[in-house]
From Swiss-Prot:
Its EC number is 3.6.5.-. It is an enzyme of class 3 (hydrolase). It comes from Shewanella denitrificans (strain OS217 / ATCC BAA-1090 / DSM 15013). One of its GO terms (biological process) is ribosome biogenesis. Mg(2+) binds at S173, T193. Its main location: cytoplasm. This is GTPase Obg.
Length: 388
């Protein structure tokens, strides 16, 4: 199945049902009073994370989604039934953004998690609600409010502990094949990897972490060169980044300059992503003599002015990959757990906070119920005239 990590959709919640004007009329009950029921609430639209989904391709072809409208109220105090909620299944790791306001609505990071993206309209009131000691036969009602309408941008961000980044043909896909059972395509030409790949690494029995491989970056990627930087978003949730360098590029280019270009593209995309823990990993060390290897590594590190962790490996021959996997496992285990809980005291102002209150007045502005204040049933009775 084709991997699609972005989709734009339009969601419409159901309108609320209108109230009913009705009166109880039975034999021997001439003054039964009002019995108009309320309308039903409109159905809401939810996103729900499902681990059985791994792409947003369905929403590329089906863009409009509408929940059910609430039914109108009826006589005998019958309340209209509420509209059925619409639940849209999305992959775990999906982020929902309002296309108009660019506000982040929420992230779905766990299987079964639900997110309200469009709230159904409120129900209208029947005339029973307006009965009072001075108004025994009210003839007013209210209409249901419209449901919320949103244009959403869905973004799928892969959930991984370790992210791989580097130039094309640095050996990222070869590394993920060496340490996991993932089988991304490997070839001797640039941009072999066209979509992100995930692999589960098991360095020790019962202990594992997830690693993500994204297409390679080149200088100018932020301006659209190569495959651009659109896949960098899949590294945003990673705990640590592995910056893989070809220690001896076949084209004679400088590994230090290549590394600086990658860092520059990271900073252009997101300073927060560029500030994540990053390890420098030199690959293809089997192509050099052992006595020249350390000297070459030291020279590149000095040219980069690198102060972080440095590792060497040969992903093709699986030399140093096991040790690196164990280091990653221990490092991830030492990090504090990610707190995904939401502060219940935090106040977040969304676009639709006052939506229903604002619409309640507008949808009912045509209803003038002043004539109800002095309404008397006797005014509508049959007039009997006696003559002598």
């Amino acid at each position: 199945m084709k991997f699609i990590d972005e989709a734009s959709i339009r969601v419409e919640a159901g309108d609320g049902g209108s109230g009913c004007v009705s009166f109880r009329r039975e034999k021997y009950v001439p003054d039964g009073g009002p019995d108009g029921g309320d309308g039903g609430d409109g159905g809401s639209v939810f996103l729900q994370a499902d681990e059985n989904y791994n792409t947003l391709i369905d929403y590329r072809f089906e863009r409009f989604h509408m929940a059910e409208r609430g039914s109108n109220g009826r006589g005998r105090d019958c309340t209209g039934h509420g509209g059925v909620d619409l639940i849209l299944k999305v992959p775990v790791g999906t982020r929902a953004v309002d296309d108009e306001t660019q506000e982040l609505i929420g992230d779905l990071t766990a299987h079964g998690q639900k997110l309200l993206v469009a709230k159904g309209g409120f129900h209208g009131l029947g005339n029973t609600r307006f009965k009072s000691s001075t108004n025994r036969a009210p003839r007013q009602k209210t209409l249901g409010t419209p449901g919320e309408v949103r244009s959403l941008r869905l973004e799928l961000l892969l959930l991984a502990d370790v992210g791989l980044l580097g130039m094309p043909n640095a050996g990222k896909s070869t590394f993920i094949r060496a340490v996991s059972r993932a089988t991304p395509k490997v070839a001797d030409y640039p941009f072999t990897t066209l979509v992100p790949n995930l692999g589960v690494v098991n360095p020790r029995p019962g202990q594992s972490f997830v690693i993500a491989d994204i297409p390679g970056l080149i200088e100018g990627a932020s301006d659209g060169a190569g495959l651009g930087i659109r896949f960098l978003k899949h590294l945003e949730r990673c705990r640590v980044l592995l910056h893989i360098l070809d220690i001896d590029p076949i084209d004679g280019s400088s590994p230090a300059e290549a590394a600086k270009a990658i860092v520059a593209e990271l900073e252009k995309y997101s300073p927060k992503l560029a500030a994540k823990p990053r390890w420098l990993v030199f690959n293809k060390t089997d192509l050099m003599l052992e006595e020249d290897l350390q000297e070459r590594v030291d020279a590149i590190v000095a040219e980069m002015d690198w102060q972080g962790d440095v590792y060497t490996m040969s992903a093709f021959n699986r030399i140093g990959t096991k040790e690196l996997s164990l280091k990653l496992l221990d490092y991830i285990a030492s990090l504090p757990p990610i707190d995904d809980s939401i502060d219940p005291d935090s106040e977040v102002e969304f676009k639709w906070d006052n939506y229903h209150e604002a619409n309640t007045d507008s949808v009912n502005e045509d209803y003038n119920d002043d004539f109800d204040d002095d309404f008397d049933d006797d005014d509508y009775d049959v007039e009997v005239i006696y003559q002598r």
